[in-house]
Every structure is written in structure tokens, then in C-alpha cells.
A protein has these predicted regions:
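Membrane-helix boundary elements
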Residues: 38-64
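Select subsegments of transmembrane alpha-helices in polytopic membrane proteins
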Residues: 14-18, 90-100
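Alpha-helical transmembrane segments and their membrane-interface junctions
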Residues: 99-119
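Alpha-helical transmembrane segments and their immediate juxtamembrane interface regions
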Residues: 122-153
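Membrane-helix interface/capping segments
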Residues: 62-83
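Non-cytosolic membrane-interface motifs at loop->transmembrane helix junctions
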Residues: 40-43, 118-126
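Alpha-helical transmembrane segments and their helix-start/interface "positive-inside/aromatic belt" motifs
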Residues: 1-18
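Alpha-helical transmembrane segments of multi-pass membrane proteins
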Residues: 19-33, 135
Length: 159
């Protein structure tokens, strides 16, 4: 696959993920919240804190999509193994980890003030674990891109 074609497909995927995230945050989460509180008005106090939690947690996801867009642009310019991409991927790794920890800490705090269910905390452990795995994979990828950039630089100097 050529660089420009790869850039195009990456951008299409990033746009699709951004639109799906927008639908989830603007439509699905509020709708699910209303469905859950309809049978039990006692839990209606939990709706707004949960909605705010999800919206705040979505912001870092869009920052990561922006960083992915920047990486795609660099790939299109045939700068796949550049230090700029390393910085973007490393920053994305840190943001993923921060978002997972934020989500976990806020959920535990909400559980402590009785705005959350212990079962949600249990399910959240798996979500946080998946985020940590993705963060580690991104960190490893940034390390490999550094090595590839060094090799490419050495190759360019020897020719």
C-alpha cells in the first residue's frame, strides 16, 4: 500500500471513530441513562454525574484521534519513522493511561459516595486493564519508531 493511500485510509478510520464517538456521547449514553432511570426514579440523582463523567472522559479520546490524524499526515508525507510521530504516539500512550486512571478513580469516588454500583467497579477493572494494555502497546510502538527513525537516519547518511 502506498503512503498516500495508507494516509487516506487512516484518516477515514479516524473520522469514522470520531463520528461513532460523537453518536455514543451525544445519543447513546444519554438515551441509556434515561432508560435506566425510568423504572427507578431513586437513581435519577446518578444520571448527571455519570453523564459528566463520560463526556469528560471522551475529551482525551478526541485528543488521541487528533494525534492519530497528525501521524497519518506524516505517513502521507513519507515521514513514517520521524521523531514527530514518536512524540505523538508517546503522548497518546500517556493520555490513554491518564484517561483510564481518571475513569477508575472517579468511579471509585462515585462508589464511595453511593452514586455507583460495585458491579460497575468490577466491570471497570476490565476496561481499565484494556486501556493499560493499549497504552503499553503504544509506548512500545513509539520505542520501535525511534529505533526505525535511527536506522533510517543512518541509512540516509551512508548513501
Amino acid at each position: 500500500m502506498r503512503q498516500k493511500e495508507l494516509e487516506k485510509w487512516l484518516k477515514i478510520v479516524i473520522i469514522a471513530v470520531a463520528l461513532c464517538g460523537l453518536v455514543v456521547c451525544a445519543v447513546a449514553i444519554p438515551w441509556i441513562g434515561h432508560v435506566l432511570i425510568a423504572p427507578d426514579p431513586q437513581i435519577s440523582d446518578m444520571y448527571i454525574p455519570w453523564l459528566v463523567l463520560f463526556i469528560i472522559s471522551a475529551i482525551p479520546c478526541y485528543v488521541i484521534l487528533y494525534l492519530g490524524w497528525r501521524v497519518a499526515v506524516n505517513i502521507g508525507k513519507d515521514r513514517s519513522f520521524s521523531l514527530e510521530n514518536v512524540r505523538h504516539i508517546k503522548l497518546a500512550s500517556k493520555i490513554i493511561l491518564f484517561d483510564a486512571l481518571y475513569f477508575f478513580v472517579v468511579n471509585v469516588c462515585m462508589w464511595r459516595i453511593y452514586v455507583n454500583h460495585p458491579g460497575v467497579i468490577l466491570a471497570l477493572v476490565f476496561i481499565v486493564f484494556a486501556c493499560v494494555v493499549v497504552s503499553v502497546v503504544a509506548a512500545v510502538l513509539s520505542h520501535l519508531v525511534v529505533k526505525a527513525a535511527d536506522l533510517q537516519e543512518q541509512s540516509d547518511l551512508t548513501i
